């Protein structure tokens, strides 16, 4: 069973040339200079740091971190070990903390909203706000789980097909799974008003 924990509080934010300040996510460093109508707001690299104890989890569980948005590029480091890099300020991404997780941890997220020719959009009529401007969550999952690293997308793809007379429907479900032993079967059930109306399973 997956557990989701809010991870928005108790961050330290550092802007170049300034002392760290305590912030709660969501946060952007352009809250003031990005809303005055000019095009002179700060675009550069800033750092978010958080000290935290490892969340309670079983030996056969994994601990992941989910970012709903980091504008525009991000580097995630845990206990001085770089875990991932992400480009794209408007997409969710997740990272497995388990290999570097200790009892007490230092998490550093370096975020950069500088102009970048490899990250879109390139131009817009809005501010390219920098920061961790959406929620961050801890995810605790079994070792065998629906995939979390598919570019932030859900691991389930559901495609309905309704008959022309609207009397019947077929549903195709595809699941991306991680660390599943050979022969593993996934059971899907369709429920309506608390009652199961259909079920199927596949490898």
Regions inferred by a protein language model and the residue ranges of each:
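Accessory beta-strand-rich segments of carbohydrate-active enzymes
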Residues: 3-5, 9-16, 39, 43-149, ...
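Short, well-ordered turn and helix-capping elements at secondary-structure junctions
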Residues: 33, 82, 90, 160-162
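Beta-strand-rich binding/interaction modules
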Residues: 76-78, 166-202
């Amino acid at each position: 069973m997956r557990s989701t924990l809010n991870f928005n509080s108790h961050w330290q934010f550092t802007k170049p040339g300034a002392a760290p300040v305590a912030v709660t996510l969501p946060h952007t460093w352009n809250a003031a200079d990005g809303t005055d109508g000019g095009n002179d707001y700060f675009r550069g690299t800033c750092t978010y740091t958080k000290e935290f104890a490892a969340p309670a989890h079983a030996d056969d569980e994994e601990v992941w971190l989910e970012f709903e948005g980091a504008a525009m590029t991000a580097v995630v480091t845990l206990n001085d070990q770089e875990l991932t890099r992400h480009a794209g300020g408007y997409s969710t991404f997740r990272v497995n903390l388990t290999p570097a997780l200790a009892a007490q941890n230092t998490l550093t997220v370096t975020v950069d909203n500088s102009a970048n020719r490899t990250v879109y959009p390139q131009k817009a009529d809005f501010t390219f706000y920098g920061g961790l401007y959406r929620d961050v969550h801890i995810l605790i999952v079994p070792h065998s789980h629906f995939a979390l690293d598919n570019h932030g997308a859900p691991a389930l793809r559901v495609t309905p097909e309704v008959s022309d007379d609207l009397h019947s429907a077929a549903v195709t479900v595809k699941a991306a799974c991680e660390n599943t032993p050979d022969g593993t079967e996934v059971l899907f059930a369709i429920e309506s008003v608390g009652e199961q109306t259909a079920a199927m399973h596949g490898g």
